[in-house]
């Protein structure tokens, strides 16, 4: 059962918007390798605005994800890629439906 989540907003610089999109598209492989991250989405809502929404069974798995390779790669390149620091909001999962 999913109990906690993260909602991360990223605003790319004009000159790096395609690179941010490419990074997020490729990051799914890292997310797939995280056994404690059963739900992970990378979304784009406009030309410059990107989101990561992911959900976890518990706070330990969420923290492991925050300490993992996706966050490390993002933070290592945030100043170069993003127009502002990423907004990382922890959330509680009230309800969920994920099917494939």
Predicted regions and their residues:
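Intrinsically disordered, low-complexity acidic/polar segments
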Residues: 17-19, 61, 97
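Short, surface-exposed ligand-recognition loops at beta-strand->loop->(often short) alpha-helix junctions
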Residues: 11-21
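Short hydrophobic/aromatic beta-strand micro-patches
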Residues: 9-11, 53-55
């Amino acid at each position: 059962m999913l109990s906690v989540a993260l909602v991360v907003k990223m605003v790319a610089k004009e000159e790096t918007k395609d690179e941010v999109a490419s990074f997020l598209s490729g990051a799914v492989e890292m997310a797939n390798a995280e056994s404690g991250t059963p739900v992970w989405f990378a979304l784009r809502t406009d030309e410059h605005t990107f989101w990561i929404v992911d959900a976890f069974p518990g706070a330990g798995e969420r923290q492991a994800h925050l300490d993992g390779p996706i966050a490390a790669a993002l933070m290592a390149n945030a100043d170069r890629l993003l127009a502002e620091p990423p907004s990382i909001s922890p959330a509680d999962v009230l309800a969920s439906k994920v099917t494939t």
